[in-house]
Regions:
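Extracellular glycoside hydrolase catalytic/binding regions
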Residues: 161, 172-382
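Hydrophobic faces of well-ordered beta-strands that scaffold small-molecule active sites
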Residues: 5-11, 74-76, 110-114, 163-165, ...
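N-terminal carbohydrate-binding accessory modules
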Residues: 1-71
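Aromatic-rich peripheral "rim/lid" segments of glycoside hydrolase catalytic domains that contact
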Residues: 336-437
């Protein structure tokens, strides 16, 4: 696997929940994250929803489809409580067991990604508790996470399907912490007391210990993956001196996130962003292979497309047809005696004109929809192509995410989510080519 470029997709929102990816799961509550969903839902209802969701969100058919697209890896985010040894959290490790069976059946590798920690490592909803980031300040919880990693390594270390284990997802830097929209937004202010960014010194120490413990239970042909902590260029010396074998540095690169801070949402800006990222990646790869573990083609340039060439055209067609009808009616009524016998023809003409209007507007709407879809497809493919060219300089890439919002049709207000959904991107021709395999 190490000699082969990684081409993968994340199985997000399966074992680690994110409200924006499937709001239906959070219905009836105002919870922003999984922790508060668990606190607010009655226990029986929570159990029912979680079971229904986990049984259906990812199935064997999904992994078969993924393999059929020519991908070779799935990254599976898992929560810190997946072994179910802390009440009231239930085990979900059996679903990870299933994923390994399916992955091995279809020739896929699995990257296990420890996505959350007790107390959160970034303050995001994907860390399980919005606005709280204090895991790293509690030595007992740090030790607990290390034991979770050890158990994962012992359980799956010799599985054919294991690519590796990522020890921690997105531990947050000072800069990102202080610019994140979730910082300071904890529902329980007391619970967030002591929150702050994850210092680089702590992270290096934690990574070294995590590597040591994983290597005690996991062979060297299985990779250990470290997230860059939003500090991509800070790791050169660390990996040169560490004496580590078969390790990767994971970086997450989102144009969508970059756009939040810039007023220009155009391809030339994307090229500048990607060019800078590629320059940094090439520099870091002299010390360690770099993996783009999360990215997507969602951009404001494509998601919020409006084509002004077609605006108003439907009104023009409708107005023209109604004007013709009105002029004909006026001419008949102006000389009613002479045209008394034409009343039947007038009614027929009126019906034909109205039918013509309906057909013309339907045709216009169909053509406009097709034109907008093609324009949007071109824009998404342009972004996909420039990103994929950039990732060619890396050890590989993993798309975020496989699916969003189940199979339901997204509302107009949710249409921006399509670019995060790999299945829909493939089926709409925005990236790759769908296979029948």
């Amino acid at each position: 696997m190490t000699a082969e470029k990684i081409r993968g997709v994340n199985l997000g929102n399966w074992l680690v929940l994110e409200r924006w990816m499937e709001p239906e799961l959070f219905r009836g509550t105002d919870a922003e994250d999984e922790t508060w969903l668990r606190r607010l839902l009655p226990a029986k209802e929570l159990e029912r929803r979680l079971k229904e969701h986990r049984e259906s969100w990812i199935t064997e058919a999904d992994l078969k489809w993924i393999a059929g697209q020519g991908l070779n890896l799935v990254r599976i985010p898992v929560p810190w409580f997946l072994f179910g040894d802390r009440a009231p959290y239930e085990s979900c490790v059996e679903y990870l067991d299933r994923a390994f069976l399916w992955a091995e059946r279809y020739g896929l590798k699995v990257l296990i990604d420890l996505h959350t920690t007790p107390g959160n490592q970034n303050g995001y909803d994907n860390g399980g508790l919005v606005g709280v980031c204090r895991w790293h300040r509690d030595p007992e919880e740090v030790e607990y996470v290390l034991t979770v990693l050890t158990r994962l390594g012992a359980r799956y270390g010799n599985r054919e399907g294991l690519f590796g284990i990522e020890v921690l997802n997105e531990p947050i830097s000072w800069l990102v912490y202080h610019s994140a929209p979730t910082t300071g937004r904890a529902r329980d202010r007391e619970e967030s007391r002591g929150s702050g960014h994850v210092p680089l010194k702590f992270l290096r120490t934690f990574y070294l210990e995590a590597y040591r413990r994983l290597r005690e239970v996991m062979p060297e042909d299985k990779a250990v993956v470290f997230h860059d902590g939003f500090r991509l260029t800070a790791w050169n010396a660390f990996f040169r001196r560490g004496g580590m074998k078969n390790v990767y540095l994971d970086t997450h690169q989102y144009i969508w996130a970059m756009e939040m801070f810039l007023p220009f949402h155009k391809p030339f800006v994307y090229r500048l962003f990607l060019g800078h990222a590629e320059k940094q990646i090439r520099k870091v790869q002299k010390a360690v292979p770099v993996l783009v573990g999360e990215w997507c083609i969602c951009t404001r340039h494509a998601s919020f497309l409006r084509n002004h060439r077609y605006e108003g055209k439907g009104t023009d067609i409708l107005g023209t047809r109604l004007k013709e009808l009105s002029e004909f009616t006026d001419s008949v009524m102006a000389d009613a005696d002479r045209h008394r016998g034409l009343v039947g023809k007038l009614e027929q003409k009126e019906a034909e004109a109205l039918q013509s209007v309906e057909q013309s507007v339907e045709q216009f709407l169909r053509e406009r929809k097709e034109a907008l879809q093609e324009k949007q497809r071109e824009r998404y493919r342009e972004v996909a192509d420039m990103e994929l060219r950039t990732w060619e300089s890396t050890a590989g890439w993993i798309y975020w995410s496989y699916k969003l919002c189940g199979n339901r049709r997204l509302t107009a207000g949710e249409s921006w989510k399509y670019g995060w959904d790999f299945r829909r991107c493939v089926r709409r021709g925005w990236i790759g080519e769908e296979s029948n395999g």
